[in-house]
A protein has these predicted regions:
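Non-catalytic alpha-helical scaffolds and adjoining flexible linkers that form interface surfaces
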Residues: 1, 6-217
Length: 217
């Protein structure tokens, strides 16, 4: 069984768990999504071999839409996390996100926080404070065009032209900065923005979790 691990000290680690598919395997009940583990690896190549495995803290239990959101978080992290590079802050963000999903908080806020923190940790932070050309603060009454990995620039866009996927209202950017996503239009704009930003690094291959969830994440 080929398994992708997110670790505190080594970033992403891909490893083979020999015999894990067997009914009596010592790994079978442990190698599950959202289960914190204590794991040892061996091998010199890119793909390691799983050694000892012990249960860590209590497993995260997700159901319904929150399960699909957790799957989305796992897949995005797996696709973007560099193997064998320490990302302690990113691991903490991942852990906090799963714990939050286990609760009853607003899923849109939880996911947008995760995505923004992920991009920042990987060096692609989105500046929601100012126009990258003029360095003027984002204005609630203006419209801005977004370029991934660059930022926002003021545009003469009007409400009639809002179908342009890269154009955002200043009021929505400010609301996202404050994680105030109560308005449906703001939550939709925030999701669109993060799809653009993440898409620049995820590539053209569709996310399986997004397909399962009907494209909503």
């Amino acid at each position: 069984l080929l398994v992708d691990f997110s670790t505190t000290d080594y970033g992403g680690v891909r490893a083979v768990a020999k015999g894990a598919r067997r009914e009596k395997s010592k790994y079978r009940s442990l190698l599950q999504s959202f289960h914190p583990l204590l794991v040892s690896f061996s091998g010199r190549g890119e793909v390691k071999t799983v050694g000892a495995v012990e249960a860590g803290l209590g497993a995260i239990v997700l159901q319904g839409e929150r399960l699909y959101s957790g799957m989305y978080v796992n897949e995005v992290l797996c696709r973007l996390l560099h193997n064998h590079e320490e990302h302690k802050a990113l691991y903490k963000n991942y852990q906090d996100t799963l714990i939050a999903l286990q609760g009853d908080g607003n899923m849109e806020v939880i996911l947008r926080k995760f995505e923004l923190s992920l991009l920042a940790e990987l060096g692609y932070a989105i500046n929601l404070d100012e126009d990258y050309l003029s360095h003027q603060p984002i204005d609630v009454d203006c419209y801005y065009r977004f370029t991934p990995d660059v930022g926002f620039e003021l545009t003469e866009q009007t409400e009639d032209d809002e179908q342009n996927a890269r154009v955002f209202r200043g009021k929505d950017l400010i609301a996202l900065r404050d994680f105030d996503l109560k308005e449906k239009s703001t939550a939709t704009a925030a999701k669109r923005l993060l799809r653009l930003a993440l898409g620049a690094h995820l590539g053209e291959k569709p996310l399986n979790s997004r397909t399962l969830f009907g494209g909503q994440r």
